Amino acid sequence: MADHWKETERISMTKIKICGLKRPEDVEMVNEFLPDYVGFVFARSSRQIGGEQAIYFRKMLDSRIQTVGVLVNADLEEIEALCSAGAIDLVQLHGDETVEYMDKLYEKISNPIIKAVRVRSQEQILEAEKLPCSYLLLDTYCKGVYGGSGTGFDKSLIPVLEKPYFLAGGLSAENVCENIR
C-alpha cells in the first residue's frame, strides 16, 4: 500500500507540456485537454512561430495554461521583448547558452528559465543541475540538432535530482506512462 502511495504522489507531481503550437487548431486542442504548459517555438524549426503569432495564440489560450518560449542561442533582447509583451511565462533555452548568458538574462527578466540538456551521460546531467535556472529539460542528444528529433534516450542515465525537470525526446502516447515512473 505504501508503494502505491509513493507512486501516486510522484505521478501527481507530473506536469504536461505540449510543444510546437503553430495553428489556431492547436490552441483549440490544448484548451480542450488543458496541459500545464504549451511551448511556442521561436527557434528555426518547422514549428517556428513569431512573437506576434505567439501573442495572438496567448489571447486564445485558456488562462490556466502557462506558455513556454523555446529559443536557441537567441539575442537577450528578443527574449526580453517576448517576456515583456506577455507572450511567454517561462523561457526554455535549448542551445549552447552559458552560465554567463543565463546570468545576463536574469538581469533582464524575472521569468523562470528552463535549460535544455542534450543527454549523453549521468555526469553531464548532474553538472547541469548546478546551472542558474529554475528547471532542466532532459532531451535526446543528436549530433547537429538542438531538439525535436523524435527519438528517446536511456532514462536510466537520469540520476536523482533536486532541481525539477522536464522530460523530452521520443515521448508518445504509447510510452509516456512508462517514462514518467
Regions found by a protein language model. Name each.
Residues 5-181:
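Conserved N-terminal beta1-alpha1 strand-loop-helix module at the mouth
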